[in-house]
């Protein structure tokens, strides 16, 4: 699990709101999921995050062997394109939290806007989830300012 903070409105050209800050607590991360042929940039702004890359998902938990694994650290970026790195898992294995900023968008020629991320569920079917927000950036800022 992680905290997902969005900035701006849903524009219809990405799965969910296109500008996202994610805060990854220690020993927390995402499930293996697919980004539906979008482009993305992931920028690490604090800590480090392990990223495992997988082939496109199938309804078979035995197909979850990663094909590549690397760690992105503060100041480093990685990317996703329709043909590269679409299916991945992010995990914070460091002794501190990690924070990332992501930007998502479908390509100009892509007219199919899939609003979901796909993942393999516990019953071995391909399921989908809508990438929701835990807070908008302004809501998070307001709550922080009220406390401090």
PLM ranges: what are they?
Residues 20-35, 71-74, 81-85:
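Conserved short histidine dyad/triad with adjacent acidic residue
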Residues 1-26:
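A short glycine-rich, His/Asp/Glu-containing loop-to-beta-strand
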Residues 41, 53-88, 125-130:
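Short acidic-glycine-tyrosine-enriched beta hairpin
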Residues 41-43, 95-110:
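A short hydrophobic beta-strand segment most commonly corresponding to one strand
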Residues 89-94:
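Asparagine-centered strand-capping/turn motif at beta-strand->loop junctions
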Residues 120-148:
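Long hydrophobic alpha-helical segments typical of transmembrane helices together
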Residues 26, 37-55:
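Glycine- and acidic-residue-biased ligand/ion/polar-headgroup-sensing regions
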